């Protein structure tokens, strides 16, 4: 046994104990203040040598406006939770190689400190892969600029990038581990790796990277589905399992066989589910979940609710899935039908689970914070717009097609332009479209292709020589789960052909839409792919929802912040606009709509619409 492995085993035994017994009735829960040691002891966890049952809920700092972190944490404490869990999203913090951002909304250390101040321990899941229905599973898109990159493997280039990231993250969060007086009692190694592969050498590399990055004063552990646990776990670390509502007894029975001496914990209890564009809105039965949670707690098992509060995948950060070969991009809302809604309202599910926790622990939690209901604000009147064609940046000339990543672009849109020399008819084929394209001939819309529908070609009539071909492509979200990672470059990633002949000599326009200040609006409303601009007054900022039922497909920006995507196929038809992102007085909104039409009014309403699909 190597010295490093020996040290790792000692660290695991020191830091991975969480007892599976509830806090004694009518006692106070342990405080996260001071130094603590969490360890696994047989089938339960212990905190400082005393049995400790983890009652956790997931809240992702990046999906909640910073001004609301404390409100959501207080609501977790008021439900009876003693712990919160969060992923850390690499792509938010290292937006280009070696350039890190932990400020403002990205100040994850402040989120952890606020959790401690509110009486909560923290489970940290730093990945580097996180899944989470998040673009590229949290990996930064710039990794894919390397044509030989193989993420989530022992590929030297990937390990070097992951090492730099985790070491920098350690500077932020290692001091906040429970062994150092912080609230972080546990740190997850990778994330459900057993669903991806079985390379234990790779898992050991990530384990040791975390230790070397300073994550050695909290319990390290792994998490997988029970069936995948042998592939994704490490023998020296505790292993927890993830499953959805209705599966608890069967999944824990599997864990009993796989790890008869290990702690009993559900690392992700899916008390809701996420949505894809064009598919149904998911809900789960709160009464059945309350019964199942009561059973788990009565057994002394520890639980992390995934999610407690889902929030919003603001901007471009929604992920996607590949299921049986079908691409499914996630909606902007991460409401998840969980105890606390997208805008922070407490659902019936919240109070049912709260009652269960109080009954099982004997502890009366504090009262929830006062509600902050969303409000309807005055409708926004649009009077100015500009077509995207009037606002193109300097193009990149290329003989062949280039992806977004080839051009150093991470998110947004990209325009491919070339000339067709001779009039002809035939099939226009886009090989490897990622993810949605509109095709224009001499500025006239000719059709759209959607990866979601497995569309890659359409018949076109080129009626004139020297016809301009424009292909406007949206990156609808990179796949975040499965074996698709190394193929998730955005834009067009292979050739475009017309009548089986490759098209060349492209002018390529990156359109990240990260700065819209230079747009030149005219006092009219255009149609097609357009930017629409308006100013609107707010007397008292409050949460509200932008009603997108009159819009087509695109993105909304308010006061320079990208709120997220809208699409008239549903099921999501509103976009959450947090009150703290509004100003008293004048505010600015920009809507980019690929299918724009001159409808001058967009309402702002008091409720989310998450379950309305087009016919």
Kindly label every feature range from the protein language model.
Residues 107-124, 147-184:
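An active-site-proximal structural segment forming one wall of the substrate-binding cleft
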Residues 212-213, 217, 245-341, 345, ...:
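Catalytic-core region of carbohydrate-active enzymes that cleave or remodel glycosidic bonds
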Residues 426-440, 469, 536-559, 566-567, ...:
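Aromatic-lined ligand-binding clefts that engage carbohydrates, nucleic acids, or primary amines
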Residues 54-65, 90-107, 144-164, 188-199, ...:
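The substrate-binding groove and active-site-proximal loops of carbohydrate-active enzymes
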Residues 98-106, 117, 127-153, 203-208, ...:
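Aromatic- and acidic-residue-enriched segments that line the glycan-binding/catalytic groove
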Residues 25-83, 113:
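N-terminal carbohydrate-binding accessory modules
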Residues 69-135, 207-212:
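Aromatic-lined substrate-binding rim segments of carbohydrate-active enzymes
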């Amino acid at each position: 046994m190597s010295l490093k492995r020996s040290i790792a085993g000692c660290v695991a035994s020191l830091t991975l104990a969480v007892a599976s017994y509830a806090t004694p009735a009518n006692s106070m829960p342990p405080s996260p203040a001071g130094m603590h040691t969490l360890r696994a002891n047989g089938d339960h966890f212990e905190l400082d040598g005393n049995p400790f049952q983890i009652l956790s809920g997931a809240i992702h700092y990046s999906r909640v406006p910073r001004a609301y972190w404390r409100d959501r944490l207080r609501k977790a404490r008021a439900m009876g939770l003693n712990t919160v869990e969060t992923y850390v999203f690499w792509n938010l913090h290292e937006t280009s190689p070696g350039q890190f951002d932990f400020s403002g909304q990205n100040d994850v250390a402040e989120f952890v400190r606020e959790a401690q101040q509110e009486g909560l321990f923290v489970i940290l899941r730093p990945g580097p892969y996180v899944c989470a229905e998040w673009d590229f599973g949290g990996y930064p898109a710039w990794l894919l600029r390397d044509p030989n990159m193989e993420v989530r493997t022992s590929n030297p280039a990937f390990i070097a990038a992951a090492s730099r990231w985790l070491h920098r993250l350690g500077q932020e969060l290692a001091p906040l581990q429970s062994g150092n007086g912080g609230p972080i009692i546990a740190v997850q190694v990778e994330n459900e790796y057993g669903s991806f592969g079985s390379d234990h050498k790779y898992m050991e590399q990530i384990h040791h990277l975390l230790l070397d990055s300073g994550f050695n004063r909290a319990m390290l552990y792994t998490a997988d589905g029970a069936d995948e646990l042998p592939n994704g776990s490490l023998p020296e670390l505790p292993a927890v399992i993830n499953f959805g509502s209705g599966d608890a007894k069967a999944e824990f029975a599997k864990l009993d066989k796989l790890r008869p001496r290990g702690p009993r914990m559900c690392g992700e209890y899916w008390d809701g589910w996420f949505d894809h564009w064009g598919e149904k809105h998911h809900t789960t039965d709160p009464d059945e979940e309350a019964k199942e949670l009561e059973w788990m707690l009565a057994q002394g098992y520890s639980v992390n609710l995934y999610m407690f509060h889902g929030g919003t995948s603001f901007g471009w950060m929604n992920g996607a899935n590949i299921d049986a070969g079908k691409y499914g991009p996630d909606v902007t809302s991460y409401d998840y039908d969980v105890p606390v809604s997208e805008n922070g309202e407490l659902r019936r599910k919240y109070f049912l689970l709260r009652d269960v926790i109080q009954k099982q622990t004997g502890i009366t939690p504090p009262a929830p914070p006062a509600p902050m209901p969303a409000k309807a604000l005055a409708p926004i009147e649009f009077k100015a717009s500009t077509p995207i064609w009037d606002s193109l940046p300097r193009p990149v000339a290329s003989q062949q097609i280039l992806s977004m990543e080839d051009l150093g672009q991470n998110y947004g849109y990209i325009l491919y332009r070339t000339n067709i020399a001779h009039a002809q008819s035939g099939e226009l084929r886009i090989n490897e479209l990622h993810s949605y394209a509109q095709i224009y001939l001499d500025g006239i819309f000719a059709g759209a292709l959607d990866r979601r529908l497995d569309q890659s070609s359409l018949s076109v009539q080129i009626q004139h020589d020297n016809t301009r071909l424009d292909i406007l492509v949206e990156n609808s979200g990179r796949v975040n789960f499965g074996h698709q990672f190394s193929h998730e470059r955005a834009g067009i990633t292979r050739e475009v052909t017309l009548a089986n002949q490759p098209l060349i000599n492209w002018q390529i326009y990156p359109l990240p839409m990260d700065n819209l200040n230079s747009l030149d609006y005219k006092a009219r409303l255009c149609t097609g792919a357009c930017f629409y601009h308006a100013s609107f007054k707010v007397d008292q900022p409050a949460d509200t929802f932008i009603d997108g039922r009159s819009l087509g497909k695109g993105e909304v920006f308010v006061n320079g912040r990208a709120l997220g995507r809208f699409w008239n196929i549903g099921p999501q038809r509103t976009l959450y606009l947090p009150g703290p992102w509004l100003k008293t007085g004048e505010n600015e909104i920009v809507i980019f709509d690929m299918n724009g039409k001159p409808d001058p009014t967009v309402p702002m309403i008091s409720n989310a619409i998450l379950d309305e699909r087009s016919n």
